[in-house]
Amino acid sequence: MENIKTTTEQLRTEANIQRKKVSEVAKDLVEFCEKNKATDMLVSGPLDAHNPFQEKKSCSVL
């Protein structure tokens, strides 16, 4: 019975959450990414000089 009460309470809480349209939120997300892309590593990626995962280039003589 306790499980049903907990589930009911959770569902009521979720039902009261104010929702926004995906089209509005997507526009806000794109604006945020464009505004912060110069400093956001997840958007622009690391600089090649500071990327520890980049393969080391070696000099080969033919």
Curated annotation (Swiss-Prot):
A Pfam family reported for this protein in Swiss-Prot or TrEMBL: G-gamma
Sites of Cysteine methyl ester modification: C59
Alphabetized Gene3D superfamilies for the sequence: Transducin (heterotrimeric G protein), gamma chain
SUPFAM superfamilies: Transducin (heterotrimeric G protein), gamma chain
GO molecular function, one term: G-protein beta-subunit binding
Source taxon at top rank: Eukaryota
Residues linked to a lipid group, S-geranylgeranyl cysteine type: C59
Membrane topology: Lipid-anchor
CDD domains: GGL
Keywords linked to the UniProt accession: Cell membrane, Lipoprotein, Membrane, Methylation, Prenylation, Transducer
GO biological process, alphabetically ordered: G protein-coupled receptor signaling pathway; sensory perception of taste
Maturation propeptide residues: 60-62
Signal peptide range in chain numbering: none
Gene Ontology cellular component annotations, sorted alphabetically: heterotrimeric G-protein complex
InterPro entries documented for this protein: G-protein_gamma-like_dom (IPR015898), GGL_sf (IPR036284), Gprotein-gamma (IPR001770)
Subcellular location: Cell membrane
Family: Belongs to the G protein gamma family.
Function: Guanine nucleotide-binding proteins (G proteins) are involved as a modulator or transducer in various transmembrane signaling systems. The beta and gamma chains are required for the GTPase activity, for replacement of GDP by GTP, and for G protein-effector interaction.
Subunit structure: G proteins are composed of 3 units, alpha, beta and gamma. Interacts with gpb-1 and gpb-2.
PANTHER family linked: GUANINE NUCLEOTIDE-BINDING PROTEIN GAMMA SUBUNIT (PTHR13809)
Protein name as catalogued: Guanine nucleotide-binding protein subunit gamma
Protein species of origin: Caenorhabditis briggsae
Gene: gpc-1
